[in-house]
């Protein structure tokens, strides 16, 4: 079973990498671009087939390591 964790900065938290990407896109001639925010995608291969147990395990991983709950949001997909 595969888990995907999408981590992004909370609204209001400065995102210098997103700002740099936005500036680079503008310098390449792309127009009509508003705010750019960068996040990360983490894929984890899990053993077993119990979706509820997998969700709980990945939730614990997020709280302990994968995301900083003070400045980041995360979303979990189990598939």
Each model region followed by its residue ranges:
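Short, conserved charged micro-motifs
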Residues: 12-16, 49-56
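Conserved functional loop/turn residues at catalytic and ligand-binding sites
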Residues: 29, 45, 69
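Short glycine-/aliphatic-rich beta-strand segments at the starts of folded cytosolic domains
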Residues: 1-11, 40-44
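Solvent-exposed beta-strand sheet faces enriched in polar/charged residues
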Residues: 6, 36, 45, 77-79
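N-terminal glycine-rich anion-binding loops that anchor highly charged ligand groups
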Residues: 31-37
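C-terminal structural segments of small proteins and small subunits
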Residues: 52-78
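Short amphipathic alpha-helix segments
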Residues: 12-28
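Short capping/connector residues at structural and topological boundaries
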Residues: 18-19, 38-41, 71, 75-76
